[in-house]
């Protein structure tokens, strides 16, 4: 029987894909406000969509976010109730929230300790309403 490719230590989590209504607005949010880099972007005219990859490091070493923009999407996406959030580590959650709030970013859960733990966290929303948890890590 062949070796399970997921248990060889060579499998790796590559990216999470989210659909975005306004690619320019999302690119600005993830690059300018959250400090990620645009890693690559490609239009697919025959499928009428664009894929853009953003992250804090190269895809060969880091997990990144794939932003999918369907050109004919006029309405906001229904985010459903299955997806919760993804998390980013920052050295100072309160300062990060202050900076993001000054840019008009919605902060549904301000910086503070977790209810059932000691970590300082906050939740912000991206332009499409996806929740992003900020976790304080020094």
Task: Locate each region found by the language model.
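Core segments of cupin and vicinal oxygen chelate
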Residues: 10, 17-62, 102, 115
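N-terminal beta-strand motif that seeds the catalytic metal site of vicinal oxygen chelate
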Residues: 1-27, 83-86, 135-138
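Vicinal oxygen chelate
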Residues: 2-9, 12-21, 39-42, 50-57, 63, 75-101, ...
